[in-house]
Amino acid sequence: MVKSMYAYVREAWARPDKSDVKALLWDRMQVWRREGSVTRIDRPTRIDRARALGYKAKQGIAVVRVHVRRGGRRASRYVRARRSARMGKNSSTPGKSIQRIAEERASVRYPNMEVLNSYWVGQDGKLKYYEVILVDGHHPSIQSDKNLAWLANPTHRGRAERGKTSAGRKGRGMRTRGRGTEKTRPSIRSHANQGK
């Protein structure tokens, strides 16, 4: 059976360090580092991943590249009244993933659009890069699309901020059901915050 073009793209991105993607990222990173934290782009870098997550090349859909710092939370150092061992700075981590932070920043930059999904496109020593798919639910071409018309419903407003995207649901423990996930429902804050 003949493989499609998307299959070859998917295989190349499955192991970026072992394929031609490594050389591409080397060149692209030098340009991406000089860009802003949220940059709108003409077309997705990973077309296979974007289409799998709902992207379509039509009006009302935009793709932005977002970079977020790598590592734990950058909490400021206490000024007084603690020994350094009691500051708790070595393992201070945020309660959400870096991908989720990227989605929220894209949502804030484009308040008239909703985050559909996002995917990883690269990282260097300091930053992680994600591409976020944004949809304008009020655009006529979106409202007439049977796969995307649901985003026009006001119920889905602020999806990224409420953890309703794929990355958000993963961070809230909603990917699995049943045994071992009793504390994550009805929400991650229920059961005295024992879900995380």
Swiss-Prot record:
GO BP term, pick one: cytoplasmic translation
Cross-referenced SUPFAM superfamilies: Ribosomal proteins S24e, L23 and L15e (SSF54189)
InterPro entries (UniProt xref): Rbsml_eL15_core_dom_sf (IPR024794), Ribosomal_eL15 (IPR000439), Ribosomal_eL15_arc (IPR020926), Ribosomal_uL23/eL15/eS24_sf (IPR012678)
Keywords: Ribonucleoprotein, Ribosomal protein
Short name of one Pfam family: Ribosomal_L15e
Positions of the UniProt region annotated as Disordered: 156-196
A Gene Ontology cellular-component term: cytosolic large ribosomal subunit
Bias (Basic residues) ranges: 167-178
MF (Gene Ontology): RNA binding; structural constituent of ribosome
PANTHER family per UniProt: LARGE RIBOSOMAL SUBUNIT PROTEIN EL15, RIBOSOMAL PROTEIN L15
Alphabetized HAMAP family for the sequence: Ribosomal_eL15
Family: Belongs to the eukaryotic ribosomal protein eL15 family.
Protein name: Large ribosomal subunit protein eL15
